[in-house]
Curated annotation (Swiss-Prot):
This is Valine--tRNA ligase. The gene is valS. ValRS has two distinct active sites: one for aminoacylation and one for editing. The misactivated threonine is translocated from the active site to the editing site. It is an enzyme of class 6 (ligase). Its EC number is 6.1.1.9.
Length: 880
């Protein structure tokens, strides 16, 4: 055999994966085939933010997409997997501002234009890092079509959509309560707000009635906003306060009268049943204020400090003002009590500060008509299909309850809003291009929410608004979107309604929703916990294929997956098993070419069985891939490869390979190569590097496994009789191995093997295949008959259609074996006692790290199982 056909003795992923990706790129294998007769299949990558490194969640997300696209490519589809990245507005701007702050520079020092130049430099650097990570993962992306959400083509699409929605009265400018980040000084979308449970307080205060007839008790968590109160409210049906409705109270510290109003919003059962109404600082109060025509008093600046309407508290930070106001209320005798409590408080995802509900003039998308169209589409044949289906209800519920979408951001990095204001008249103009006399106009300084442009991703990347674009005509709507359940509302939903509005089509046929990657203890990975895993570190240690196998094998639609290094070890071991099996095949087919593969001649039962099992595996895996049930597909592949091919067929093939029948050798060699070839094709979408490496070393046709034909079922290979017979044969061999282990007898020691069966098919099959029984069971006497009497001194096993007996006379000394097992039992009993002593020690359980305690519990379980198994063996021997 020539040197280049050998596989190295050891599987070393780093050496195998190095250079392979570039070779694929050089061969131009990731672009669409261009075959107009082929059915198109397209995926657009969920664009990662250009903010830094990709995390394990990205690795999972992109692995699933790559698996789908690689399989479809092999199945003959005209595939496009389009890469791209998201400018990620606030996230990227915050990173660059942080970097500049380390040099003592603010964005205001640079000015808008120079600051944006700095962000573009950041984008180029991190886009390069992301591409390197994609390459390490082996992602078969068509880089010739790579897009960025601030590309000119995509920017044109953004302007077109904005102007069109504005002209349809679906975009408007108005004053509303929005999420405000006082540090970044910008509005935030709901997804940019992270809710954390923190310790806070309910401050109970008394507001005196203006007529001096008493006081009303109010409770709030934000006393600093009371300076902006313009009413207090009770429920119209609350009998306790009927006589108060229409009266006024004096607002403490401000000394102004505000009305007592009645509104259904008030919960009679909560607190005192009286609430303060601050329309400029609370979204619910804003709605109440609109219903009752209340003034809106905004007492805070953009940076979270108190403004001139806050009186003596002007200039104070909002939390410092809270302390001062509480102190002053106490001094006035208006503070009744303070109750400590835990409550959920919104924090900015990017800056970490507490988000302030704030009255602000912003741009909004009117969601009602758009949501209605999206919901109606889900009742048609063109509905987007969710995997798992329960997320369709999640989508519909969100659409039913959706609020208008605030789309303006007070940032410099992003799509600047295409609206201009006349310098003299204040007239507003909205259009695709700036006004002709641009010197007389000033453009709106705000930019659009990142999600506005990413909502257009599936069609803007294909050339829209140029609907004559070749890619748009060929690949839109796309076939499948793969994404996590955490952004179904904020991205998936918006893509659906924008696509329906502007193209009249759903953006994708299927949405595969996966869960989150968690650590071994089930916790979400986060910086604060320090439990994040860099996928590049995992690849460095185990290789990309092992990581991809783990990610695919733990994948069920909608479910979370737990990462552990133990699972990574198992992934590596599986690939190593494939590697060693491939080395065996390659060494035994020396000199063979693809043209030599021929198994049309007589086949052994093992040959017929492995081809039948291959057919079953191909059918099942293909079906499971179509349903996106990759975890189950992985289990099917694992069982077929590890058990059927490696542990059974390869071992059985040795009888032929090491024999003298040349015709049988040719058939078995051909089936070994063919089955391995089909295995590599089935595995290639999941573990592309190692499969390509091995495939190049076996007899094959074609330039690359990337574009090789995916396996299909060959009905002529099915042999149910061989499959049934082999299952019985395997049962016999497994049972004999188990009995040998139980009585501590090695394979080298011959046995008497008696097989009793009343099943003619089983009897004929076993009788015709005694050579396998002789090889794997080493019997000095083998009897297969209907007339066997159970020996007195024997171990037995009941099988499918048969019963076997293994006489122990002369094989073992039962008393000696019992004595040996009793010593082993004593050992496990002591181990159980030791570990249970540890676990019953409260100090150990309380003080030891969780992982140490869990390890001891795992030991206890293991020792108890071993103790029980030995007890059973002793009882079995004593019963003979």
């Amino acid at each position: 055999m020539s040197e280049e056909k050998n596989l190295p003795t050891k599987y070393q992923p780093t050496e195998i994966e190095a250079g392979r990706y570039q070779k694929w790129l050089d061969q131009d294998l990731f672009k669409p085939s261009g075959d107009k007769k082929a059915k198109p299949y397209s995926i657009v990558i969920p664009p990662p933010n250009v903010t830094g490194k990709l995390h394990l969640g990205h690795a999972w997300d992109t692995t699933l997409q790559d698996m789908i696209i690689r399989q479809k490519r092999m199945q003959g589809f005209d595939t496009l997997w389009l890469p791209g990245m998201d400018h990620a507005g606030i996230a990227t701007q915050a990173k660059v501002e942080e970097k500049l702050a380390q040099q003592g520079i603010s964005r205001y020092d640079l000015g808008r234009e120079k600051f944006v130049d700095q962000v573009w430099e950041w984008k180029e650097e991190y886009a390069s890092h992301i591409r390197e990570q994609w390459a390490k993962m082996g992602l078969s992306l068509d880089y010739s079509r790579e897009r960025f959400t601030l590309d000119e083509g995509l920017s044109e699409a953004v302007r077109k959509v904005f102007v069109s929605l504005y002209e349809k009265d679906l975009i408007y400018r108005g004053e509303y309560i929005i999420n405000w980040d006082p540090k970044a000084k910008t509005a935030l979308s709901d997804i940019e707000v992270i809710h954390k449970d923190i310790e806070g307080a309910f401050y109970h205060m008394s507001y005196p009635l203006s007529d001096g007839s008493g006081v009303v008790e109010i409770a709030t968590t934000r006393p600093e906003t009371m300076l902006g109160d313009t009413a207090i409210a009770v429920h119209p049906e609350d009998e306790r306060y009927q006589e108060l409705i229409g009266k006024t109270v004096v607002l403490p510290l401000v000394d102004k009268e505000i009305p007592i109003i009645a509104d259904d919003y008030v919960d009679m059962e909560f607190g005192t049943g009286v609430v303060k109404i601050t329309p400029a600082h609370d979204p619910n109060d804003f709605e109440v204020g609109n219903r009752h025509d209340l003034p809106r008093v905004n007492v805070m600046n953009e940076d979270g400090t108190m403004n001139e309407l806050a009186g003596k508290y002007e200039g104070m930070d909002r939390f410092a003002a809270r302390k001062a106001i509480v102190s002053d209320l106490k001094e006035l005798g208006r503070l009744i009590k303070i109750e400590t409590m835990n409550h959920s408080v919104g924090h900015s995802e990017r800056t970490g500060v507490v988000v302030e509900p704030r009255l602000s003039t912003q741009w909004f998308v009117k969601m009602g008509p758009l949501a209605e169209k999206a919901m109606k589409n889900q009742e048609t044949e063109d509905a987007v299909e969710f995997y798992p289906p329960r997320f369709n209800q999640t989508f519909l519920r969100w659409m039913e309850n959706v609020h208008d979408w605030v789309i303006s951001r007070q940032l410099w990095w992003g799509h600047q809003i295409p609206a201009w204001y006349h310098k003299e008249t204040g007239e507003m103009y909205v259009g695709m291009e700036e006004p002709a006399d641009s010197e007389n106009w000033v453009q709106d300084s705000d930019v659009l929410d990142t999600w506005f442009s990413s909502a257009l991703w599936p069609f803007s990347t294909m050339g829209w608004p140029n609907e004559a674009s070749e890619d748009y005509q060929r690949y839109f709507p796309t076939s499948t979107l793969v994404t996590g359940y955490d952004i179904i509302f904020f991205w998936v939903s918006r893509m659906i309604f924008q696509s329906l509005e502007f193209t009249g089509e759903r953006p994708f046929q299927n949405v595969l929703i996966h869960g989150l990657i968690r650590d071994e203890q089930g916790r979400k990975m986060s910086k604060s916990l320090g439990n994040g895993i860099d996928p590049m570190d995992v690849i460095e240690k185990y290789g990309a294929d092992a990581l991809r196998w783990f990610l695919s094998n733990g994948s069920a639609p909608g479910q979370d997956v737990r990462f552990s290094y133990e699972k990574m070890d198992a992934s590596w071991n599986f690939i190593n098993k494939i590697w060693n099996a491939s080395r065996f095949v390659i060494m035994n087919v020396e000199g063979m070419t693809a043209a030599d593969i021929d198994f049309s001649g007589e086949k052994t039962v093992a040959d017929r069985w492995i081809l039948t099992r291959l057919n079953e595996t191909v059918a099942r895996v293909t079906e499971l891939f179509d349903r996106f049930e990759f975890g189950e597909a992985g289990r099917q592949l694992y069982n077929f490869i590890w058990d059927d091919f490696c542990d059974w067929y390869i071992e059985m093939s040795k009888e032929i390979l090491y024999g003298d029948n040349e015709a049988a050798k040719q058939t078995t060699r051909s089936i070994l190569v063919y089955t391995l070839d089909q295995i590599l094709r089935l595995l290639h979408p999941i573990m592309p590097f190692v499969t390509e490496e091995i495939w190049e070393k076996i007899p094959h046709q074609g330039e690359s496994l990337v574009v090789a034909e995916y396996p299909v079922v060959h009905e002529e290979f099915n042999d149910e009789a061989a499959a049934r017979g082999m299952e019985v044969l395997k049962e016999v061999i497994r049972s004999v191995r188990n009995i040998r282990a139980e009585v501590n007898t090695p394979l080298s020691k011959p046995i008497t093997l008696l097989i009793k069966t009343n099943d003619t098919e089983v009897e004929e099959f076993l009788t015709a295949n005694t050579s396998y029984l002789e090889r794997f069971c080493n019997p000095e006497e083998l009897v297969i008959s209907r007339e066997i009497e159970a020996p007195e001194l024997a171990m037995s096993a009941v099988l499918t259609g048969a019963e076997l007996f293994l006489p122990l006379a002369g094989l073992i000394n039962i008393e000696e074996e019992i004595a040996r097992l009793e010593k082993e039992l004593d050992k496990w009993t002591k181990e159980v006692k030791r570990v249970q002593g540890k676990l019953s020690n409260e100090r150990f359980v309380s003080n030891a790290p969780d992982e140490v305690v869990e390890a001891e519990r795992a030991k206890e379980k293991d020792y108890l199982e071993k103790q029980e198994a030995v007890k059973e063996r002793i009882a079995q021997l004593r019963s003979i």
